[in-house]
Amino acid sequence: MKDTIVLYPNIGRGHLVSMVELGKLILTHHPSLSITILILTPSTTPSTTTFACDSNAQYIATVTATIPAITFHHVPLATLPSNTPSLPPHLVSLELARHSTQNVAVAFQTLAKASNLKAIIIDLLNFNDPKTLTQNLNKNIHTYFYYTSGASTLALLLHYPTIHETLTKNYVKDQPLQIQIPGLRANITTDDFAKDSKDPSNYSSQAFLKIAETMRGSFGIIINTFEAIEEELIRALSEDGTVPPLFCIGPVISAPYGEDDKGCLSWLDSQPSQSVVLLCFGSMGSFSRTQLKEIAVGLEKSEQRFLWVVRAELDCADSVDEQPSLDELMPGGFLERTKEKGLVVRDWAPQVQILSHDSVGGFVTHCGWNSVLEAVCEGVPMAAWPLYAEQRVNRVIMVEDMKVALAVNEDKAGFVSATELGDRVRELMESDKGKEIRQRTFKMKISAAEAMAEGGTSRVALDKLAKLWKES
């Protein structure tokens, strides 16, 4: 019976993909281990439709067919109480995991009886107290947290009790507070926090307090980053006597998946080297009709070649089955006027393959950490347009600390003007500042490859983890 590591991802698509890639990474270098991924299987209730259950199911089926060493264990996803407040998607996923605690605990017991269970790795958004989840398991089965974003936002999270205390004493609406924690050089204020986490009394703030407390009590924290990209912050966290051991094993990025049924790659084949800017905003990055039209105007003004993945908000449609056409979403004549320079596709495109294509020279991103790492690993400079969760903080880190991006600035309502987008795209692709960012990103591409190579910092961290598991 093989030693088994159980991975418990959040149901959000980016979190699931990152956890699967972690499992693949473990198996690549330590094939004597077995990987089981626990999957909360959602219903089609309104509270879960945000997470594109069908696409997750298709992705899981692909992994099952191509990597038999990874097995999936499905667990019923609890439904949310009718009095659950309206929450943003990442907090809905947190609540769904919290209400599924008992089902997950039973699943862990079942897996422990059927395998030689060595460790459990839990996504940070499934932050239920590990003692509750593992109370009936052998005490030698250690629990780790997997943090799918970078060390900078992890530091903010682990220091959140102190930040919360400061907010409680000094919080005034619309008056930002400077955030200072060891190792953080970037100029971050409470304005960079997600809207739902600025008020110290609301649900989000209380959840972050609980997450910080729970993560500090774990056996270790596995981070999807590498030392060269966030060196000072990683050192500061490692030297903090109250933080569990850190294992920086990244960059863990998605392997190419899905068919290019929209012809993105063949279109790129016909474009000049490094001439195309990709606009793609993640699985939950959707926009209103007004914002979509503004993006279109901005792209046309920029006079740059572009590949744009469009995802419209649900209220843009008359019904779920009757989505508006691209012509209806765009300004009149836009698709015809830009057909020689641009390609617009709906909902999804093979982002990893696109970023690796020689024709791509820039990336307008929502600042999700998976996307940031994918761009870094291909040496593609970015324009940072955050949408939700920790992404505004990521923007500051990308621009000021990592220096791999330009900031796309929005108004107080979160709206980005055509002029702002057009100027940033042109600056990224044509200016001396854009060239500097491209050179910096290319250096980080080399550092990322070195970290993952034999003897590299991330490879050493993974080997250390595997040794701990095998000896437990």
UniProtKB/Swiss-Prot annotation:
Pfam families cross-referenced by the UniProt entry: UDPGT (PF00201)
Keyword Zinc-finger assigned: no
Keywords: Glycosyltransferase, Transferase
Residue ranges that the Swiss-Prot or TrEMBL entry lists as coiled coil: none
Superkingdom of origin: Eukaryota
Stated name of the protein: UDP-glycosyltransferase 2
SUPFAM superfamilies: UDP-Glycosyltransferase/glycogen phosphorylase
Tissues where the protein occurs: Highly expressed in roots. Expressed in leaves and stems.
Annotated GO MF terms: UDP-glucosyltransferase activity
Enzyme class: transferase
Cited InterPro entries: UDP-glycosyltransf_plant, UDP_glucos_trans, UDP_glycos_trans_CS
Entry function: Glycosyltransferase that possesses isoflavonoids 4'-O- and 7-O-glucosyltransferase activities. Shows a successive glucosylation toward the acceptors producing their corresponding 4',7-O-diglucosides. Can use genistein, formononetin, daidzein, liquiritigenin and naringenin as substrates. Also shows a 3'-O-glucosylation activity in vitro.
Family of this protein: Belongs to the UDP-glycosyltransferase family.
Origin species: Pueraria montana var. lobata (Kudzu vine)
Record bears the keyword Signal: no
Binding of UDP-alpha-D-glucose, residues: 283, 348-349, 366-374, 388-391
Entry EC no(s): 2.4.1.-
